[in-house]
A protein has these predicted regions:
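Conserved helicase motor core of P-loop NTPases
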Residues: 1-101
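C-terminal accessory regions
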Residues: 69, 78-169
Length: 169
């Protein structure tokens, strides 16, 4: 249900994040989002116009990515690249990838090499990885038998600017 909710939000033009329990779940969910968006024509499917990320997934125009390390040499309007920043890809060039920040709309030119070593697909992540991320709407999937500490639930439940939804399965 959390995945379906995120797809519906994306169809409304919203940036989304699905927070899951494990890295394996996150990778599978990210792959699922990419394939779904490609099937709808919402992201680039041509392998010649995509770039491989450090998680092994290929993304292109229209896809959402998250930065996983700080990089002072990559800047936009005086602001440096920081771990947790989320972007929508606008164009994949030969050397650089044009992106828009989901947090503030700023435009970034990010070297392909950095995406290959420092970025992952940004549709899903673990609660530990979501700190610092901002999207329009967030869905949180926790196992019903887990004793998730309150501080982690707070972190997970404060990623969406407009809405945050919790699902227990």
């Amino acid at each position: 249900e959390s995945y379906v909710q995120c797809i519906e939000w994306q169809d409304q033009g919203k940036s989304t994040l699905l927070i899951a329990g494990t890295r394996d779940q996150v990778r599978d969910i990210n792959r699922r989002f990419i394939l779904e968006r490609r099937s709808k024509g919402q992201s680039e499917a041509d392998p010649a116009k995509t770039v491989a990320l450090r998680d092994g997934l290929d993304v292109g125009r229209g896809d959402q990515i998250v930065c996983r390390k700080n990089e002072d040499d990559i800047t936009s309007d005086g602001k440096s690249m920081e771990n947790g920043m989320t972007f929508r890809i606008e164009n994949v060039g030969r050397r650089d990838v044009s992106c828009v920040s989901l947090a503030d709309g700023s435009r970034w030119e990010i070297p392909r090499e950095f995406l290959e070593t420092g970025c992952e697909a940004g549709y899903a992540c673990t609660v530990h990885r979501c700190q610092g991320m901002t999207v329009d709407r967030c869905a949180v999937l926790f196992p019903s038998d887990a004793n998730t500490p309150c501080n982690l639930q707070y972190v997970a439940g404060s990623r969406g600017k407009e809405e945050n939804h919790f699902y227990y399965a």
